Amino acid sequence: MIIVTGGAGFIGSNIVKSLNDIGYRDILVVDNLKDGTKFVNLVDLDIADYVDKEDFVASIVAGDDLGDIEAVFHEGACSSTTEWDGKYMMDNNYQYSKDVLHYCLDRSIPFLYASSAATYGGRNDNFIEDRQYEQPLNVYGYSKFLFDQYVREILPEAESQICGFRYFNVYGPREGHKGSMASVAFHLNNQINQGENPKLFSGSENFKRDFIYVGDVAAVNLWFWQNGVSGIFNCGTGRAESFQAVADATLAFHNKGGVEYIEFPEKLKGRYQAYTQADLTNLRAAGYDKPFKTVAEGVAEYMTWLNRTV
């Protein structure tokens, strides 16, 4: 059996899909379906069982035998960069991750988990997996950073796989439940379908992010599991592309409308990553040599998926 925490969420459900694609059906999804809309991410996927996150935590803390587990993909977390309840964030992202990690270590189960480029904070270069480059801007980034630090202490002595991925700006299918935290491509598509012009912040040609297609993220996860590689790795494309490029690709698909520029919100100033670009040196050195989709390629594929029933 393979366990995917956050399996009804964005990246988790895409990992389930990729596992299905290579023949895995014996999958336990762990999630919190208080937001019932997330069920749509699983309706076309095959899983063996579903367990509520709170019940799962109780089981692993109690040391229950969950059977023969081939791997745990730990994607379950609060991913809102605008959430400032630090206790909630640390319980969900830090303590929960430690509990799952130790369950896996005690049983030699491969543990692959979601970190984040938010660990780097507001820097505009040297996105390198090293302490000197890490200074998160928000409590979400801090919770991810602190768990990475915890893992770093354990890695040298670990006798089973521990692998963390610092996801950069992920977009693609199965993110609709994320609301305001969904990708720019998702929101631009909605605006066009509602008859509006797509909206970007003024200066968006200068805001550049490393946008990575979720299918590529899932492929990275599966490759590292199948190859038993441990460590903490950036998971981006190695390219910084502008929000304008995302809008251009969205408009190219719809072949209508033009961008409307709006003022940058005061509340985001100083807490906003204006630039991200993954350094892939360590990822490539580990042996992962597959190409990553460009924004033009990934957004075109995503638009086809989003508009398949529109």
Curated annotation (Swiss-Prot):
Binds 1 NADP(+) per subunit. One of its GO terms (biological process) is ADP-L-glycero-beta-D-manno-heptose biosynthetic process. It catalyses: ADP-D-glycero-beta-D-manno-heptose = ADP-L-glycero-beta-D-manno-heptose. Catalyzes the interconversion between ADP-D-glycero-beta-D-manno-heptose and ADP-L-glycero-beta-D-manno-heptose via an epimerization at carbon 6 of the heptose. The active site is at residues 140, 178. Its cofactor is NADP(+). Homopentamer. Substrate binds at residues 169, 180, 187, 201-204, 209, 272. It comes from the Bacteria. The keyword Acyltransferase does not apply. The keyword NADP applies. Pathway: Nucleotide-sugar biosynthesis; ADP-L-glycero-beta-D-manno-heptose biosynthesis; ADP-L-glycero-beta-D-manno-heptose from D-glycero-beta-D-manno-heptose 7-phosphate: step 4/4. Keywords: Carbohydrate metabolism, Isomerase, NADP. This is ADP-L-glycero-D-manno-heptose-6-epimerase. One of its GO terms (molecular function) is ADP-glyceromanno-heptose 6-epimerase activity. Pfam families: Epimerase. Contains a large N-terminal NADP-binding domain, and a smaller C-terminal substrate-binding domain. HAMAP family: Heptose_epimerase. Gene3D superfamilies: NAD(P)-binding Rossmann-like Domain, UDP-galactose 4-epimerase, domain 1. NADP(+) binds at residues 10-11, 31-32, 38, 53, 75-79, 92, 144, 170, 178. InterPro entries: Epimerase_deHydtase, Heptose_epim, NAD(P)-bd_dom_sf. It is an enzyme of class 5 (isomerase).
